[in-house]
From Swiss-Prot:
Belongs to the universal ribosomal protein uS11 family. This is Small ribosomal subunit protein uS11c. Its main location: plastid. It is found in: Plastid, Chloroplast.
Length: 130
């Protein structure tokens, strides 16, 4: 009895023409996640996954790299054409990330600021005495 040879055929991925881009910026890192309309994550990238470590992750250049990686992957593999952008966090690199997503060829329909504002939040740390 001869063995049957099975070919590794990749399953074609579904094309997503509309999606949502979540940009989460913190003081230390930037994370860009691209989802479909339902909210299922399609691809993501972060400054740390772009081989940047330590304080370099907090720069605008790192956010640019992360956004470009995620956007290129979404355009190449899932044919993403237009997206809503939801931005969270106080980081400095938000504008750079948005600009890079637009440069990758994704049409931005809505820009929405989603950062949480505390209603008097946590107690601040004790004042430093020197």
């Amino acid at each position: 009895m001869s063995k049957q040879i099975r070919k590794n055929v990749k399953k074609p991925r579904k094309k997503i023409y509309r999606g949502v881009v979540y940009i989460q910026t913190t003081q230390n890192n930037t994370i860009v996640t691209i989802t479909n309309i339902k909210g299922d994550a399609v691809c993501w990238s972060s400054a740390g996954s772009c081989d940047l470590k330590g304080r370099r992750k907090a720069t605008a250049y790192a956010a640019k790299l992360a956004a470009a990686n995620a956007a290129k992957k979404a355009r190449r593999e899932f044919v993403l054409k237009e997206a809503k952008v939801l931005i969270t966090g106080p980081g400095a690199a938000r504008d750079t990330a948005i600009h890079e997503i637009h440069k990758a060829g994704i049409k931005l329909t809505i820009l929405r600021e989603k950062s949480g504002v505390p209603h008097n939040g946590c107690r601040p740390p004790k004042r430093r005495r020197v």
